[in-house]
């Protein structure tokens, strides 16, 4: 808070303290995940989708496994703050886009339920063992 005050941006920030993301995310206009290093399958992206919030993230390979740009989220060039700001501005100023991203994200997260993931692993194991997907 003190650093924000020193920078003169304290009136622009909300610092709610520790809250569960599921409780906080529905109050957000968008979820921004600007990672510059890979982190596997991002739980944050899925949390955004579960709560119906449009997702904006860096175009890391791991994020692109989840996010289809302009379909279920927006992708920004990794480490490029201008690209990230442009994606944020697009999302915040285009209500139709924001609604579509949230709806598609909510559908996309269904691909990652425990049951669905287990089915996909079992299909993979069967194919690797040469038994098809009976």
Task: Describe each region flagged by the PLM.
Residues 1, 90-110, 127-131:
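Conserved donor-nucleotide binding/catalytic region of nucleotide-linked donor-dependent transferases
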Residues 1-17:
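Nucleotide-activated donor-binding/catalytic signature segment of Leloir-type glycosyltransferases, i.e.
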Residues 17-28, 50, 64, 68:
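Short acidic alpha-helix that forms the nucleotide-activated donor recognition element
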Residues 26-40, 53:
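Acidic donor-binding loop of glycosyltransferase active sites
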Residues 37-42, 49, 59:
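Short glycine/acidic-rich beta->alpha loop that forms part of the nucleotide-sugar donor binding site
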Residues 54-57, 67:
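Short hydrophobic beta-strand element within catalytic cores of glycosyltransferases
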Residues 69-70, 74-81, 90-96, 110:
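Conserved acidic donor-binding segment of nucleotide-sugar-dependent glycosyltransferases
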Residues 114-134:
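C-terminal alpha-helical cap of glycosyltransferases
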């Amino acid at each position: 808070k003190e650093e924000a005050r020193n920078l003169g941006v304290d009136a622009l920030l909300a610092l709610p303290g520790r809250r569960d993301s599921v409780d906080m995310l529905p109050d957000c206009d968008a979820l921004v995940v600007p990672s510059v290093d890979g982190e596997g399958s991002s739980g944050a992206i899925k949390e955004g989708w579960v709560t119906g919030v449009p997702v904006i993230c860096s175009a890391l390979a791991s994020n692109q496994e989840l996010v289809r740009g302009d379909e279920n989220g927006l992708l920004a060039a990794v480490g490029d703050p201008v690209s990230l700001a442009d994606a944020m501005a697009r999302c915040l100023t285009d209500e139709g886009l924001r609604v579509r991203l949230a709806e598609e994200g909510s559908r996309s997260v269904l691909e990652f339920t425990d049951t669905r993931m287990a089915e996909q692993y079992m299909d993979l194991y069967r194919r690797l063992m040469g038994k098809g997907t009976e």
